[in-house]
Amino acid sequence: MNPNKRLLSLDVLRGITVAGMILVNNTGKCGYNFAAFAHAKWDGFSPADLVFPMFMFLMGISTYISLCKYNFQCRPAIAKIIKRSLLLIFIGLVMEWFITAIDSGNYFDLSQLRLMGVMQRLGICYGITALLAVTIPHKRFMPLAIILLIVYFIFQLFGNGFEKSADNIVGIVDSAILGSNHMYLQGRQFVDPEGILSTIPAVSQVMIGFVCGKIIIDIKDNDRWMLNLFLIGTTLLFAGYLLSYACPLNKRLWSPSFVLLTCGIAALSLALLLYIIDVKQNKKWFSFFEAFGANPLVIYVFSCIAGGLLVHWHIHTAVFSNLLNPLFGNYFGSFMYGVFFLLFNGLLGYVLLKRKIYIKL
């Protein structure tokens, strides 16, 4: 496929993941979530666990496409890579500061600022993957991604890395480097879901996406790249499932089995959408998600800030308690709050899309 042509299927699948993240993160009342929209508490897997890793996989594909225009030359691309990586990390830190500040009312107290988070993980993993893309042969990407997963698995295997306890190596490293006060929920869950060690397999996630991006762009024959993507997706899916017997599926730890399984699902989903949307040109049913996927990071950042303000101003509680809960009950009312908030964010995405405004972070 032409790397200069915008892949609508990529926008749509990104949009599905961003919409999923907004729904999962913005329910009417904590604890009243349908199972599909609640993360697994520790080991296990739910649809809610898929949205963030799928977004990271798609970021790997976008990284390949964006670096094509530099012909993967280090000198012209490196400034852009470093700038984008640092910008994502900075935005993540500002978001964490803002959410902490409006909760505490103290805008100058950084003692409990969470240092890692979704945007920080995106920035770090993008930066590492993109720098590797302009410095090493791409044929080494998949072997290197597997090696990183093996290294992380060894850490977990010999460091009590599968248990939800204080002596889990993943949590020990997070606490030692970040400090408990700067971890998710001040370290009360022992590990940070976007912590230090678990960034290793997260890099693998983006690298596998990069490899799939290479397949989509470099192979010109539609049947061939679809077959390759299907085979890779199926292999990763079954590998993740089989590995889960020795290495449990765990989003909070970003376990190797979790990486393989979610990459497999993402590859198969993208192959299907590429065929339906970009090959067969069946686009009309997907415009809703395109509005979220054309400017995914802008919509995500906006949703986090808007969601935090609605909670701080007590609008969130008022809408749920006085309107949605009496009409729909606890669970469905909580879900409907997320749906209305999703549509609210979709308005921004729709306006940007209609005006052909694409904000790249």
Identify what each model region corresponds to:
Residues 1-361:
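Alpha-helical transmembrane segments and their immediate juxtamembrane cytosolic regions
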